[in-house]
């Protein structure tokens, strides 16, 4: 046990020790240690998680005869229910693709897709700043991989030119909206690149984009009009859609490969049908949430400008606004100060972000008012 204790002490010395906070949620507010604060750290981008009207409308349609609260099994055994197929068909239809497949979480999706679809003769080329879950999936695949510099497509092209002919298939891996910087990948350019090389597939994670961007809330791929050109388009239900789980839209043959070879899918008890029914209910309504998307973009543009004025650093183009302070100690102190002012802001430190880029990740939601965000900016 001494070795474990020493590890924790080392984390504390570097201001990298983490703990799980005790929180009470009240809509867009959080209470911690008897202090009520505006939640500036949520991924509930459309503000749907505490929407009582939506919740009551969903419950009333069942009249007390609710879907099961558990699946009790993997979908490949006895854990499949009609609502799963209904949601997969709805997602595929909205994206105008052949098929969709559901997963228990974005993490399950990202650690399972690449190992299922690659061989030891495959190549993965991933953006330097892709999410930890994608990195874990790459490692589990046990195939050759390189990281291209963040959003540097000349570097990616060079890697493709040097390596594609040596491998049976190549996967380009990126997020659309990057979770820590809030900047956006150029999906049109990535599509053009992958079309130049044989047996090359594009895998895009839209976890922080689905619901928020695009005319119908289908993400950056919809906004860029490239949905049909992305081989594996992943999204999650646990952020803007106020639910749980994830999906991939893809060709039917890729779906069948995943069903047969993706371990997190095969060996996990499926999500509760009740949860999947709620996801279906929300996903149906995505196109009608344009007012929320517009309001969120207005709030985001204002806050990005305010933070850039103070730091001269603003990579973000989205509702994720990084307030980059650099050092761990300064970031922890500023987060504490903002919490004392009534704003639940959290420090993000290495290894989650690169060394010397510690930041407060400010995350806006559509249920915030313009006055609340303006008042917050005063305290920055």
From Swiss-Prot:
Binding site for pyridoxal 5'-phosphate: 106-107, 179, 205-208, 236-239
Residue sites binding substrate per the record: 18, 131, 352
Pathway in which the depicted protein is active: Cofactor biosynthesis; biotin biosynthesis
Biological process terms in GO annotation: biotin biosynthetic process
Subunit structure of this chain's protein: Homodimer.
Residues annotated with N6-(pyridoxal phosphate)lysine modification: 239
Protein name (Swiss-Prot/TrEMBL): Putative 8-amino-7-oxononanoate synthase
Cofactors (names): pyridoxal 5'-phosphate
Organism from which the protein derives: Haemophilus influenzae (strain ATCC 51907 / DSM 11121 / KW20 / Rd)
EC number(s) given by UniProt: 2.3.1.47
